[in-house]
Amino acid sequence: MAFLDQIYAVCKEHDAFLIVDDAHGIGVLGKTGRGIIEDYGLLDKVDMITGTFSKAFGCVGGYAIARKEIITLLRYYSRQNIFSAAATPQTAASAIKAIQLIDQEPQWRNTLAENIEYFKTGLETLGLDYGNTESAIFPVMVRNEHNVKEAARILFEQGIYVNPISYPAVPEKLSRLRFSLTAMHTKEELDKTFSILENIRKKYKLAQI
């Protein structure tokens, strides 16, 4: 997770424009689910916030939040916006409902936080390298293009869906299994995942810490 307070201090010192992409933080981090920016108390200080509706919101599309004049500039000069279609009514309604649920049902955020800590503990017990993630996305390192795909296949065949991430999405030798946790995952499902990982970690040479 970024040291946003330090980044903000540098930007303020040098009068730099600060854009925060909080795709993995919104709906998950912060007292009210406003993301990493709320966690650091900087909601009214960053220049622009961008993110996606495809994660915590459970739909499609994305957003950019900034002062009116900046958004107007993007509307007329951003290639991504100029050559993109407007969101459908059902997409907009879905995103609005997700925002309401983030406000009204904090228990899901709390349950996800518990699952994140539980998954961390399980991976550490197995001695697996998952980087220094603080979000619901866990990159279990494999560091081999063939092995990461085979490990993902074995997991899928046993009912666990993960994304094998390899070159060119990441540099060579940095391939990983990308686990995405939700509040709906049960402890039994997470324990099953640990059991499979324990069985395959030597054969597919999952990276150890």
Task: Indicate residue ranges for each PLM-predicted region.
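Active-site core of PLP-dependent enzymes with the aminotransferase class I/II
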Residues: 1-15, 147-148, 188
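Helix C-cap/helix->beta junction micro-motif
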Residues: 13-14, 126, 158, 204
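Active-site C-terminal subdomain of aminotransferase-like
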Residues: 14-17, 24, 29-134
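Conserved PLP-binding catalytic core of the aspartate aminotransferase-like
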Residues: 110-119, 124-159, 169, 174, ...
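PLP-dependent enzyme catalytic core of the Aspartate aminotransferase-like
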Residues: 157-160, 169-209
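Cytosolic Rossmann-like ligand/nucleotide-binding regulatory domains
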Residues: 165-166
